[in-house]
A protein has these predicted regions:
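Active-site metal-binding loops of divalent metal-dependent hydrolases
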Residues: 67, 225-226
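C-terminal segment of N-terminal export signals and the immediately downstream linker at the start
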Residues: 26-46
Length: 388
């Protein structure tokens, strides 16, 4: 008769797949000739005590994604208080708003948190400016994460001088190498499964392993398709020092997502998402993984034929930008990339709902972030014990 440990190991091997080559990487993500402790069968010892938990003083190797319009103080503080690292999604927040949000988070937790910035130009102008960096330094933020493009070396140096660590979300090995050359402290390897704005064309685990090999000894986290404890275990066994979790965190009580958005996530199945450039008068021509709604199906392959919005076009809804600070009313144009929040009204069938391809199929409920994190970590711990 098989023992519970044997069954757990068999379950994990099934999840890994025969071709995953998981034993090629150790717990540190180093090549197999540099692996640290291993068991009597030659398997690397992997646990939830990772470089991320040790260097950043957190209980869990868990980071909530800095999702624009969704990852506001309630979610960030909930994750930080649960022993992970909560990330504020700054998106298009202006510097005064960023400052207020950071202070709100600081008043709600003594845990670890950071700020995610988009380094790119939007229809509103540059999403991130020197003033945003100044705010982070003045507020003594301990972690800043950049998305889309690698920031200037001057920003990284300024943040480092202010005692802040800097990460880069990377969609490719080349971008990871560029970021490391610029001086970042860690890479979030974003696989193509990840929801939202995402330029990656490589699945999460293969990308993770390639990035680890390319940028060693820089710390690397896994992103894309992570919604369960088994996903966490798989990422750690392939060398990740932590996980970056987005879609699962949208389906939390603290996420600032409209109830209709959360409902649609729970009801998604099959080929639930698609990558499109249809959405985004506010941020045009950027690949965006969203739920595959009827609208997304209709425009698939014809995104280039969508005309720019005109003043006479009927809007698809109304919402509020900077909802926790400045509260600016906003009329949503057709194909708006602004995510539906509790302040949003209008035609939801015409809106975009960012979602990860694999994660969305694993969602079963909306619960407090702390419960989800504890469950994922407990399940991952059980699987890793079975593996070891």
């Amino acid at each position: 008769m098989n023992s519970p440990v044997d069954l757990t190991r068999r379950r994990l091997l099934t999840l890994l797949g025969a071709a995953s080559g998981v034993t090629a990487l150790g717990a540190s993500g180093r090549p197999d000739d540099q692996t640290s402790a291993a068991d009597s069968h030659g398997r690397p010892h992997v646990s939830l005590n990772t470089r991320l938990t040790r260097e950043y003083g957190v209980r869990h190797p868990f980071v909530s994604a800095g999702m624009g319009f969704v990852a506001y103080p309630p979610l960030v503080t909930a994750v930080a208080n649960a022993g992970g690292i909560g990330i504020l999604g700054n998106a298009i927040e202006p510097p005064p708003s960023t400052e207020m949000l950071i202070r709100m988070i600081g008043s709600g937790t003594r845990g670890s948190f950071g700020v995610d910035f988009i380094h790119d130009t939007t229809a509103f102008g540059p999403a991130t400016t020197d003033a945003h960096i100044d705010v982070c330094v003045a507020e003594r933020v301990k972690l800043v994460v950049f998305h889309m493009n690698v920031p200037p070396r001057a920003w990284i140096d300024r943040l480092h001088a202010g005692g802040c660590r800097v990460w880069q979300q990377a969609a490719s090995v080349e971008q990871a190498e560029e970021a490391v050359a610029a001086g970042v402290d860690a890479i979030v390897a974003q696989g193509r499964q990840a929801g939202g704005h995402n330029k990656s064309v490589t699945p999460a685990i293969p990308l993770l392993r390639r990035v680890i090999q390319a940028v060693h000894p820089v710390m690397v986290l896994a992103s894309g398709g992570i919604a369960t404890g088994a996903d966490v275990a798989l990422a750690l066994l392939n060398g990740a020092e932590g996980v970056w979790v987005g879609t699962r965190m949208v389906a939390t009580t603290e996420a600032f997502a409209h109830p209709e958005y959360k409902r649609r996530l729970l009801e998604a199945h099959g080929r639930a998402t698609a990558v499109t450039t249809a959405f985004g008068p506010e941020y045009p021509n950027v690949p965006y993984r969203v739920l595959r709604t009827d609208l997304v199906r209709r425009v698939a392959g014809h995104e280039d034929e969508i005309p720019p919005p005109q003043p006479t076009d009927p809007p698809i809804g109304q919402t509020v930008l900077f909802p926790f600070t400045l509260r600016v009313p906003y009329t949503m144009p057709q194909f708006s990339a602004v995510v539906p929040t509790p302040d949003t009204t209008g035609s939801f069938d015409l809106m975009g709902f960012p979602a990860g391809e694999e994660s969305v199929r694993k969602l079963k409920d909306v619960r407090p972030a702390a419960e989800i994190i504890e469950e994922m970590m407990d399940d991952a711990r059980d699987i890793l014990r079975g593996w070891s």
